[in-house]
């Protein structure tokens, strides 16, 4: 079976992760003690993707939980599904990273990383055919960003041919948790560009907007935000866990979404959006799902796809529906909004269909888009970074942990390069692409003469 190993790090990562396991357990009919309570055999058919079956018939998540302080771990452990995890897979320190990337990446995190890798190795050896890793973390803090990226690079060394998928929560434009978020995020992106295969970009502000605007929640809690994220996470991998007409896995997803290796930061969306309490009673139609899914207000990160163009996109539909209708709707979207898609990648929208809908819904869809407008996120973080770095504000916290100012400069320029790469492909047209080739030929001819 094609297993996925789930890793969650830091406070944010652990809270998202805990919510994710609640959703996946519900989908597979597994209760909080790890016993199967479902009625449908399909729930067990590929339960191995995320679970290891223990000898006593219990299902144990293939999850590694890490943090540099015990607090969040304790709340996960005492949460509704806390008893389902393998106790050895909780790896935590006592010191905390204090929102400092350098502590997570170089000092505190580096001391703990070997024990995390041991657990990862043990879990990977339990797999029949490991497909890849999914990492949940935030980029604004210290542990998720610093230690998270350290772990990703170590796993990259040890398992170079396995997919690395991350769910990364970026600092929000208006809601800031700490002042050094731009530093932590820039240093993390620098790592993610090189070491991750696919990054799902999330941010709290966009999630707040969805909760407030669409779900009509007056005071959204982090629980509500994480509920949205976990619905998307479950949608991304539903094709691996349930049968369907058009299946996809992490690698197929990457092949279809990433035209240039560095441009692997995706916007995600989910439809139908339902508030936690009121699961919708009316069945949606495929056209309605498609429309809601492509809606800019539905994107879970603060970048507006209408300000850029889609290089590629992928949609996963779940529920009983006709593949033909799905294809027609997707082609319809592309024809009506052709200016929002680059014309030099033909057939750049892929759809997959999975027969089993999420719990409580008749149909649902998950959207993943590789849009050039994601540069807005990077641009914003980069501006905040530059504003502080020019004055060398708060830098002693990082240099005190043994970091060099050069690293900051490198990370900054790598992020700016990323922004200009997105911009370059946003502006590129089909004719230009051909034009470049001719120019090169002429140069060669001159040299021969």
UniProtKB/Swiss-Prot annotation:
Its main location: cytoplasm. One of its GO terms (biological process) is microtubule-based process. SMART domains: Tubulin, Tubulin_C. Pfam families: Tubulin, Tubulin_C. GO terms for cellular component: cytosol; Golgi apparatus; microtubule; tubulin complex. Residues 429-449 have a biased composition (Acidic residues). Gene3D superfamilies: Helix hairpin bin, Tubulin/FtsZ, C-terminal domain, Tubulin/FtsZ, GTPase domain. Keywords: Cytoplasm, Cytoskeleton, GTP-binding, Magnesium, Metal-binding, Microtubule, Nucleotide-binding. It is found in: Cytoplasm, Cytoskeleton. Its cofactor is Mg(2+). GTP binds at residues 11, 69, 138, 142-144, 204, 226. Mg(2+) binds at residue 69. One of its GO terms (molecular function) is structural constituent of cytoskeleton. Residues 428-449 are annotated as: Disordered. InterPro entries: Beta-tubulin_BS, Beta_tubulin, Tub_FtsZ_C, Tubulin, Tubulin/FtsZ-like_C, Tubulin/FtsZ_2-layer-sand-dom, Tubulin/FtsZ_GTPase_sf, Tubulin_C. Belongs to the tubulin family. There are nine genes coding for beta-tubulin. Tubulin is the major constituent of microtubules, a cylinder consisting of laterally associated linear protofilaments composed of alpha- and beta-tubulin heterodimers. Microtubules grow by the addition of GTP-tubulin dimers to the microtubule end, where a stabilizing cap forms. Below the cap, tubulin dimers are in GDP-bound state, owing to GTPase activity of alpha-tubulin. Dimer of alpha and beta chains. A typical microtubule is a hollow water-filled tube with an outer diameter of 25 nm and an inner diameter of 15 nM. Alpha-beta heterodimers associate head-to-tail to form protofilaments running lengthwise along the microtubule wall with the beta-tubulin subunit facing the microtubule plus end conferring a structural polarity. Microtubules usually have 13 protofilaments but different protofilament numbers can be found in some organisms and specialized cells. This is Tubulin beta-8 chain.
